[in-house]
């Protein structure tokens, strides 16, 4: 997926829902956001997206500062929007910087574009 495609996906979502806050956007889209204590170790899971039986869920590590939770939520929202058919994504700090993972790179670009 090209950068232009990702920008267009963000623009389309914001226009459709009239929302630029990822927490409210998830609510508008019917995506359930859950909070779970997943630890503070450097390799702790930061968040993940899961779609099961048409129920979309993003789980965020509640041990993280709110500003980081917002970034993680935008990243996972990117997976929900861009990678619907893939099912489950676990977001580790290492994965965020893994440029060999195209889906992680796309979700990072989505989050960056969404939050600016």
Cite the ranges covered by each PLM segment.
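Active-site hotspot residues in diverse enzymes, especially metal/ion-binding acidic/histidine motifs
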Residues: 1-116
């Amino acid at each position: 997926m090209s950068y232009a495609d990702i920008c267009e996906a963000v623009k389309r979502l914001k226009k459709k829902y009239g929302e630029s806050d990822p927490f409210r956007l998830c609510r508008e889209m019917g995506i359930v956001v859950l909070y779970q204590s997943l630890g503070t170790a450097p390799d702790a899971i930061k968040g993940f997206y899961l779609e099961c039986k048409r129920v979309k869920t993003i789980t965020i590590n509640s041990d993280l500062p709110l500003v980081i939770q917002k970034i993680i939520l935008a990243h996972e929202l990117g997976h929900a929007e861009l990678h619907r058919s893939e099912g489950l994504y676990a977001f580790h700090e290492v994965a965020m910087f893994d440029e060999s993972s195209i889906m992680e790179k796309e979700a990072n670009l989505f989050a960056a574009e969404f939050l600016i």
